[in-house]
Amino acid sequence: MTPFELLEPGSLAEAIKLLDPEDSDIRPIAGGTALMLMMKAGVFRPRCLVSLRKLPPELSRISAGSGGELAIGAMCPLSRVERSADVARVAPVIPRAMLRLSNVRVRNVATVGGCLAHGDPHMDLPPILIALGAQVSAVHPKGERRIAVEDLFAGYFETILQKNELISELRIPPQGGARTAYCKVTTGSAEDWPAVGVAVSVEQEGSVLKSARIVVSAATEKAMRLKGAEQALAGGAVDDQAFKRAGDAAADEVECISDVRGSAPYKRELVRVFVRRALRQALDGGGVAH
């Protein structure tokens, strides 16, 4: 690994000042679980890392509002999210998914903000957050902006964040009567990266499906909603035929990529099956399935 300088600012504003948008050899580092592996492999060779570990504690907090919304600081470790009673109450699908996310050593170090800013399409959290309608706050030299998580990812390991822009907070809106589930397929161990991840959020009104959000990840270049599959469900009856229709629409719509975890045609068939399975899982009570 190439030697580098480590800077440790004490505030978010100071950290942003240290990030030169014209210098790609300066990178921020939060937990570092992904970045350090890439540096050891020689994928990245930064000459300077701006550590975010000494930022104020409010950037690691979890707070629930009276209206049912949830705010999670960008520096909050995934293990704290996993154990949070507030998260379990507002979005129980998240702590359930965390139990199958890598291993406890990684979850103790990896952060919410780093998980999103890294832009890795194989991660479990982004598709779930998209299904939940979550947003991030991103701070830059001229102020702050809100970005829907579904708009955050630009491509394979790419986000729309500027080089001198940092995620400060994640916000999950009140979920009302929506029920959410996440299913993934791993071709290796349970700790392995998934070949396909599917997150869904559905709201039922009587025997009719009022709304649906269907998100696929890992099989694609970025976590993304399948709006054609959502439209195939909206306003229809809640039955296995509707779930099959949505699965077929998802398989037709999705653009899968081939990699070591499977070919694009194989992953397309996984999407077909697991969209159907995730919808049933959500309406049966939510949760995580494999």
Where do the PLM segments sit?
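C-terminal structural segment of proteins
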Residues: 1-290
